[in-house]
Amino acid sequence: MKKLMEQMAEELSAAFEKAGYDPSYGKVTVSNRPDLCEFQCNGAMAGAKAYKKAPFMIADDVVAYLKDSQVFSMAEVVKPGFINLKVKGEFLADYLKAMAADEKLSVSAAKEPKTIIIDYGGPNVAKPLHVGHLRSAIIGESIKRIGRFVGHKVIGDVHLGDWGLQMGLIITELKHRKPELVYFDDSYTGEYPEEAPFTISELEEIYPCASGKSKEDEAYRNEALEATHLLQQGKPGYMALWNHIMNVSVTDLKRNYDKLNVSFDLWKKESDAQPYIPGMVEDMKEKGFAYVDQGALVVDVKEENDTKEIPPCMLLKSDGASLYTTTDLATIVERMKLFNPDEILYVVDKRQELHFIQVFRCARKTGLVKDDTKLSFLGFGTMNGKDGKPFKTREGGVMRLETLIKDINEEMFTKIVENRSVKDKDAKETAEIVGLSAIKYGDLSNQATKDYIFDIDRFTSFEGNTGPYILYTIVRIKSILNRFVEEGGNLEAGAILDPVNDSQKNLMLQLTGFGATVENAFEEKAPHKICAYIYDVSNAFNSFYHETKILSEENEAQKASFIQLLKLTKKVLETCIDLLGFSAPDRM
């Protein structure tokens, strides 16, 4: 269906054309003076130079053709030549009826659906998720959901770090602690045990211990480097240990991502790309892209228009070892082979920008991707504490994601119990649902590229621009609809009618923005635009609620109209929070 703004622009364009002017001047925008009008057209200002005519004279000519408009209840000229507009209530009601009947609530399906891979999450195995992993998971998940909603085939890949020195460190520390394990017996030829020789908690303790030792003890570090090398060469005992590490770690990662309502289509790993490296490197050498510089194999990626130096992209170190750049390039080769995507989007810390500039340029220069394959980088800012520094525990350490979720849930549980709005037995589950909204909305309501302050007190508040406030609004609507049914009302009866007051019209106008907001949020990879939109819708609904007697309305047709408007508001808000990656409880 056509958006409200498109229909208004068509009406204005026709009026410009009838008045003898170019119809392209008929663009309509939301008014920057809502006290005077709802929308405005500045086309007469733009046309003044072309027609050598005062803008208010052009505007007068155009408005003369809007007197019998089926769209506008008001079209008036304000000097020096703005056209101020108000929409007819009947036209607005008809638009919302069509929107309610539309499966996608006015979102236009992508004309050319694309296959898009989103690389987000990106944790290293054998390490617990911490708050630094939060943004990639939350932002990537939301963009994936929005992309699917507008009609694209979007594939989410967690892309695990599983092939670096951390594996060698864990194997070395295990060998020091439990040398009797069969994995370290070179003469062993039997089947390796199915059960891992460690738990997730032991694994998470082993890595930092080994990492600390490697910084103090060079011999220990060399042993870990050798273990990494032997693993990558396919040593059977080490491969069996690697499988145990992967199984134990991935099971725990999935459990934690489930708590965040984040899911991945692919659980690909750095190691999956390793088989592609030799052929890729050889091809780059044969075609003359790769050359040896100070012992390392590199590809030049600088361009004439660069305003800062972009160093060569390193493929292999002087000892022949591969790097993150090598693995990322080989992963692109794998993705092109398996999925042939139109776009690959990486949702990672903005401090990795140089790395991805090098990788993208190298991939294009060497022909790893098609000319029209889009390689995108969404670099997010840092989540900071109230002191403006990266978020830490009270002791100054890196906070585990599990701990953050637990702290938020406890805060929400306390507030919900104080409100006494939910039975004790349901309070814990409700706190988890609302707690997730506090975390996700708190993050996503900020522009992804910017740093922000993670303020638990503010994010868990039921007032202001917060997740709990949005959920409270949805629960309020659910409560009214439930009462309506309990009183014998039929949720399917009636239709949205003209607004009876300004607050209702404002709510109706806000709802019309859904389609454009969602499409724009995907186009700009900007979930914060959906947050801003649902905050406006929630405020508009709550104003309408306080100013209007909904269930006590005596005119049955009018009451039914209110109910249909509430149903649409609920559907819009619930669709939006699903796109952001959380849901609403039945009570709060």
Placement of each model-derived feature along the sequence:
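Short, charged, solvent-exposed linker or helix-capping segments at domain edges/interfaces
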Residues: D94-M99
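Non-catalytic interaction-recognition regions
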Residues: M1-A93, K111-M588
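Short, cationic low-complexity segments
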Residues: D102-K114
